[in-house]
Amino acid sequence: MSPKESQQLVYTTQLISFLTSQYQDEIKITGANFSWKFDWNSPYLGAGATFLDNTYSIVLLGGTVRSTGSDFDVLSVTLCHEIGHILGGAPHQRFGDQLEEDWSSAEGQSDWFAASQCLPKVFQHFKEVGLINVSPSFAENSTCQKTARPLMCEWIRNASQKFSDSIYEIYIKSDGVTPRPMLSLDAPEVVQNTLVGTYPSHDNVDTVVQEY
């Protein structure tokens, strides 16, 4: 294992441990069990939330942690988003006219939970232990300067942009058509209906920006 991979494994286990301490009891209040399915040795890309046999599980494959563009910030957004599928509430995902995953929050709602509930907890804790290092100049020349918590706001915005960049590079860029989602750009369309089975073309960035 390379030094970089060792570092990735350490911060992944730290993040999983912290999120478990924050949300395990809240999930168990629903009457269900909770588990992590983290396979460091898997070369594949993948992360998700499942509900089977009265157990909520968050799946994380090692290839995701080690992928190009992934770091602690990107992993934080990824795992907070997956917890959002479990605890984010309505609206819930729907695939087709009949099949509704009434346990799983819609993609945008999961992003909202991540930005408003989970990522602030991650920022506060890991800033205190030194894994997140930000200086007062971090949020200069940013709209976050107008918020009550500019450093946290800017970290979450940057982490979310990096998350979107990684998704774009892996899954979307190859189509040669879809533009890269950017914090500095408005979505090209006005949303008329809540999307419960997918993202709009601008991905999750707009949702995160609106939280701050």
Regions found by a protein language model. Name each.
Residues 53-60, 73-86:
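Short coil-to-beta-strand
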Residues 83-103, 109, 115-126:
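Catalytic Zn2+-binding segment of zinc metalloproteases
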